[in-house]
From Swiss-Prot:
Residues 273-321 are annotated as: Disordered. The gene is bchD. GO terms for biological process: bacteriochlorophyll biosynthetic process; photosynthesis. It comes from Chlorobaculum parvum (strain DSM 263 / NCIMB 8327) (Chlorobium vibrioforme subsp. thiosulfatophilum). It catalyses: protoporphyrin IX + Mg(2+) + ATP + H2O = Mg-protoporphyrin IX + ADP + phosphate + 3 H(+). This is Magnesium-chelatase 67 kDa subunit. Involved in bacteriochlorophyll biosynthesis; introduces a magnesium ion into protoporphyrin IX to yield Mg-protoporphyrin IX. Belongs to the Mg-chelatase subunits D/I family.
Amino acid sequence: MIAFTDIVGMDLAKQALMLLAVDPSLGGVVIPSTVGSGKSTLARAFADILPEGTPFVELPLNVTEDRLIGGVDLEATLASGQRVVQHGVLSKAHKGVLYVDSLSLLDSSAVSHIMDAMSRGAVIVEREGLSEVHPADFMLVGTYDPSDGEVRMGLLDRIGIIVPFTPVNDYRARKQIVSLVMGTRNEEDTQDELRMLRGIIGAAREQLHHVSITNEQIKGLIQTAISLGVEGNRVDIFAIRAALANAALGQRTEVDDEDLKLAVKLVLVPRATRMPEREPSEEEMQQEEPPPPEEQPEQEGEDENAPPDETDSDADEEQEETPDMIEELMMDAIETDLPENILNISLASKKKAKSGSRGEALNNKRGRFVRSQPGEIKSGKVALIPTLISAAPWQAARKAEKAKKGIKTGALVISTDDVKIKRFRDKSGTLFIFMVDASGSMALNRMRQAKGAVASLLQNAYVHRDQVSLISFRGKQAQVLLPPSQSVDRAKRELDVLPTGGGTPLASALLTGWETAKQARTKGITQIMFVMITDGRGNIPLAAAVDPAAAKAPKEELEKEVEALALSIQSDGIASIVVDTQMNYLSRGEAPKLAQKLGGRYFYLPNAKAEQIVEAALS
């Protein structure tokens, strides 16, 4: 295994891990990078520089809930005749490191448990008559490939440092990596270097208590966070702690500018939602400096020491640039009157939806244990306590019967009729597939409001930690802009730059959405909803994607395609919302008909009020 000191390049990521080793209150380090970049090797090598005896626990992606948080050890309990508690992975990482490779692929239920443990510093185990609290105060180190999806925002909020980096492409560095892997390395030299590095980190931990940061430096970090569009006081605290830890590594007693720069680079910039405008250079300021104003006579009673009037400069700073024609076509999203709970209402009103809380379903494999039921051992996990309770009344009779036959028995005689299988409630998640009509007719109608509608619904999905997918349809076919993901911010960015123009391939949108839904179901997502933002005026057939000559199809053929797909989607149990963006005087009822074919809810966007939409959804 390659040691931490042997790893070539990745200096910023190594520095980040060293800061975490100095101050575990930074929460953790997340390293997003492409496959083969060495991120996982570096993360596992982090254990080399930690104090001796520090737990380093790797979490498998397929971890079950009882393995994650703990529960009753079935084998040990049956062997001893007394209940034996088994600690989960989270509590085993207490006072150490929990490492997760492919963090973005981790099950949402497991992510929720990790978030809860990081907030509490403990794991609460309540299952099968067991109620215990296990300490679980750990650092989280995660690596993932951004192409696999994004990491849940709630989890990133609890982690101080995010270090995206690209693979090493420098010739000398790559040659050094090959030589290291293929050649031999003096083990004594490696161990000496690791001991030295552990000593530096140990000294930095002691020095951390003696490092100070000024109010002006704290103010500068907070102002930088605001200018970058970074929200939340927790991030400000992480940035301050990162600066203090870096100063401690340098054995300094005061934070300097380099410490502040590193904190901004590791904590604030990866979370930036906007970039501040560049300050003009001195030359540019001299070129743009206006001529001096003509002298004016002093006003009576004017105070010579009064501060200059800042009204004009403030007004100049608040002026906004007028967008050009291209920016107008891009149409930034704006607020609309769609109610925030439209998604909840429509899911609740869908008759085919399962009962229970949003996005939750019962199963025999994973989630939160809610009850037991009779079943075979091979069909699920045995519910120990209910099984023992079921078997208890028959023990005397069964042992007597076995004794008559000369069969020796153990402490318990359990038959297949006694076996109870666990039933879990798993928040498998709701997937909202947004299909936005970006055709030319939409550009002339209500594209601005349409984008605003999607933006408000995306925010609702973010609050409930649902997954979203974004599909646009224009020209000859639909296009998946964002596969199913929990990254609402990425969906908003794709939406902001969505161009318009061309035909309306409505059938292609339905087919693409349906295929996306079917793929999601193979990954355990049970509730899916289509949200179609369109005027419903489809005019491009499916065949046009491969044969441009087929674009001019009869209207009847287009309607048959849409109707067949809509009926298939409806029969597949997928809920739908159709938001009509067409002007009243242009409408021929295309969008209401589409909603009817899908068996979904219909909303008219331009003049709709929240109360009207809620009333329509509940009727």
